[in-house]
Amino acid sequence: MLSQNQAEEAIVTNMNETEQEGGSSLEEIAEDQSMFNFKSFLWHGGSVWDAWFSCASNQVAQVLLTLPYSFSQLGMVSGIVFQIFYGLIGSWTAYLISVLYVEYRARKEKENVNFKNHVIQWFEVLDGLLGRYWKALGLAFNCTFLLFGSVIQLIACASNIYYINDKLDKRTWTYIFGACCATTVFIPSFHNYRIWSFLGLGMTTYTAWYMAIAAIVNGQIENVVHSGPTKLVLYFTGATNILYTFGGHAVTVEIMHAMWKPQKFKYIYFLATLYVFTLTIPSAVAVYWAFGDELLNHSNAFSLLPKNGFRDAAVILMLIHQFITFGFACTPLYFVWEKVIGMHDTKSICLRALVRLPVVIPIWFLAIIFPFFGPINSAVGALLVTFTVYIIPALAHMLTYRTASARKNAVEKPPSFLPSWTAVYVLNAFIVVWVLVVGFGFGGWASMTNFIRQIDTFGLFAKCYQCKPPTPPQAPSPHARH
């Protein structure tokens, strides 16, 4: 077996390799040192902290605005319990993905496979460990989930900006932000999201605490009612939105690949989740306390919070963060497309950006067809997130280490808090059964029922989903007619 140090070796990204290839004189190096250090500080991130910021920033984006809506469907107690429950099992399956990545990496390096100019992805890990059928399964679910994850960010951009400027309808804003988000084609990999991840987490932190404080200061609305849960359809729809919230680890492999020492990732997602709890729980609790059942008809919390400079700042910061999260969701799709057309090892940023553009077009189109901010989260959570980041990783881990020899030679042994392979298998089996029955089964039924109801109510290509009807022009007074 390879040593741990060998398993931890990082793959240098295309940008680093391009910069370091070729000879330079000592004088030239000295001249460029300060500029290089500044550029590296902003552009090249492969540390544990970079991974933590990426995980935390990516995990909580526009869902922050829909969690109060989920609380109105679930009720206060169930909302809090489901957040903690899905946060913990999401952290566990992210840990499983990291273990399988390290196992795959170690086996391939033992075979002297060179990953220069190649970003390892989840479907390749499944292919190397379990074969081509698992590769196809992973590729189908991962790409479809990330596609709709990008769609959701685009819908959220249009939904949010409307609360600052309602002179344009949400569909027009979707056109505009689709063009803006397309600029993410210029970001080569997760290695280059250092400054964006840091800023993104700061933006969501501000927004979460603004929501909590604004709701408390505003107080409860008159005759507020907290009747949830009232219907099974709403209950499981809300639960599935929370499952979606803590299912942001579909990009775990790409984040690990950007690290200098990927094996240190093991508990990063869990630590990121703990921080995310400090944002999602207080904000959702406070907004639901203030507005109660009114949230059932307002999936975006911004629509109920008082309009002022603080809210406008939160909207703008969330817009920027959704641009970042769009890049997080879309970058793995860019990699897949590059590999399909044979351009993945291209070093030119401009050429790579050009060949990536076709990926954005279907995302743009789908965001215009299904502009249902809120309900679409639950539908994606039930049908895609359940398999992509919960069921498939748990099953893959069980099958990879099903033999005694595989367990004996495993690069990563069971964690100290769960030292028995039997306990690991029991936990994995529980996750598979729970998510399959509750998440995919009940959640799928509830989410699709709610989603179809939105289509029946608003129609496909809805011009302005959940917008207030325009105020009819006032008739002129009798005196004005003379």
Swiss-Prot record:
Tissue expression remark: Shoots and roots of nodulating plants, at low levels.
Alphabetized InterPro entries for the sequence: AA_transpt_TM
GO cellular component term, pick one: plasma membrane
UniProt record similarity statement: Belongs to the amino acid/polyamine transporter 2 family. Amino acid/auxin permease (AAAP) (TC 2.A.18.1) subfamily.
Membrane-crossing residue ranges in chain numbering: 60-77, 80-100, 136-156, 173-193, 197-217, 233-253, 267-287, 315-335, 357-377, 379-399, 423-443
Xref: Pfam families: Aa_trans
Topology class, membrane: Multi-pass membrane protein
Organism: Medicago truncatula (Barrel medic)
Membrane side Extracellular: residue ranges: 78-79, 157-172, 218-232, 288-314, 378, 444-482
Ranges facing Cytoplasmic side: 1-59, 101-135, 194-196, 254-266, 336-356, 400-422
One Gene Ontology biological process: amino acid transport
One of the record's GO molecular function terms: symporter activity
Subcellular location: Cell membrane
Keywords associated with the record: Amino-acid transport, Auxin signaling pathway, Cell membrane, Glycoprotein, Membrane, Symport, Transmembrane, Transmembrane helix, Transport
Function: Carrier protein involved in proton-driven auxin influx. Mediates the formation of auxin gradient from developing leaves (site of auxin biosynthesis) to tips by contributing to the loading of auxin in vascular tissues and facilitating acropetal (base to tip) auxin transport within inner tissues of the root apex, and basipetal (tip to base) auxin transport within outer tissues of the root apex. May be involved in lateral roots and nodules formation.
Record: glycosylation sites: N297
Name this protein carries in UniProt: Auxin transporter-like protein 4
